[in-house]
Regions:
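Exported/periplasmic ABC-transporter solute-binding proteins
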Residues: 45-91, 95-96, 109, 116, ...
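A common structural microfeature
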Residues: 120-121, 155
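A short beta-strand-loop structural module common to alpha/beta enzyme folds
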Residues: 98-108
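Short, low-complexity disordered leader/linker segments with a strong preference
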Residues: 1-70, 300, 304-305
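Intrinsically disordered, glycine/charged-rich N-terminal periplasmic/extracytoplasmic linker segments
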Residues: 113-118, 125-133, 142-145
Length: 305
């Protein structure tokens, strides 16, 4: 009997021995749960910190303005050297690296005809004042936001790739053209190209145009770009070209003679914003800004206010 009671007491003194594995398992589960929670918490903190760092980096990064609508420009041929540089300057100054600006270069008269026929240009940059004025009168009469503006003044030079011109003046240039009756001279079409119109006016003022025409010594180019090509390639002896073209190729002093501005009709170049595209107006404003005028002066034009 005592033995039975002793055994009974012994069994009662270890009642937890049978459930301790479960408690151990529960403890392990609790520990695992705490670990998982800690892991999630650390992950969330890391993610939040990473997000904050990314946001801070984004906020501190240079902001790029989104490009606006594409701009389509109809530009006089004499601008083919300077306008691409101005466009790059505009995009950089306005922080618009992805802005699309499409340019068509041709004679001002040809571009004028295209515009009046419905060509989809936003800006017209002529080599004279008359074409934009005609455009305003014919297509936008009474619209105050379609007023032509002067963006630069061109200069006329005589250029030769084969004949020395250093040290000439108006008198000696006239004598040169008269003395050598075999030389060929190119000018842009005076009916379409303002630089050609001014070249013809200069030759007329020197009593040369009629005689040169009669001798078939004047080779007429479609525009000022083609006139320069003829002279630069040596296809003709002399070319009346835009001084900006001479500047662009870094011609030597003996290759060109800058005609005095007062010796021919001033080549004031006007432009006009044709559409309501906001970026087109902004670009037109840039042309007249000190930054835009600096490009023109560097390229051989006369600055305008």
């Amino acid at each position: 009997m005592k033995a039975d009671q002793s055994n009974s007491r012994h069994k009662q003194t270890n009642p937890l021995s049978n459930v301790s594995p479960y408690l151990k398992a529960s403890k392990s589960i609790v520990t695992l749960g705490v670990s998982v929670c800690l892991a999630f918490a650390l992950s969330a903190c890391t993610k939040e910190a990473s997000t904050d760092e990314t946001q801070a980096a984004t906020n501190n990064a240079p902001q790029t303005t989104q490009p606006a609508e594409n701009i389509r420009i109809a530009a006089a041929a004499n601008l083919s050297d300077v306008l691409p540089e101005i466009i790059e300057g505009y995009k950089a100054d306005r922080n618009l690296p992805n802005q699309e600006i499409e340019v068509t270069f041709a004679s001002s008269g040809k571009l004028y005809s295209q515009i009046t026929s419905g060509a989809p240009y936003d800006v017209f940059l002529s080599a004279n004042q008359s074409y934009p004025a005609q455009l305003a009168e014919e297509m936008f009469k009474g619209e105050t936001n379609r007023t032509p503006f002067t963006y630069t003044q061109g200069q006329l030079s005589v250029y030769s790739a084969t004949k020395p011109l250093k040290g000439l003046n108006q008198t000696t240039l006239t004598d040169l053209f008269k003395s050598d009756d075999k030389t060929k001279i190119t000018i842009a079409n005076p009916e379409l190209a303002p630089y050609g119109e001014s070249a013809r006016a200069y030759l007329q003022s020197q009593d040369l145009y009629d005689s040169l025409t009669a001798q078939k010594r004047i080779i007429q180019a479609e525009n000022i770009g083609q006139a320069f090509q003829y002279a630069h390639a040596g296809s003709v002896d002399y070319g009346f070209v835009a001084h900006s073209q001479v500047t662009a190729i870094k011609a030597t002093p003996e290759q060109f003679y800058i005609l005095p501005p007062e010796s021919y009709p001033a080549i004031l170049q006007d432009g006009m914003v044709i559409t309501d595209v906001a970026t087109a107006k902004d670009f037109a404003d840039y042309l007249r800004s000190p930054e835009g005028q600096a490009y023109f002066s560097k390229a051989g034009y006369l600055a305008v206010k």
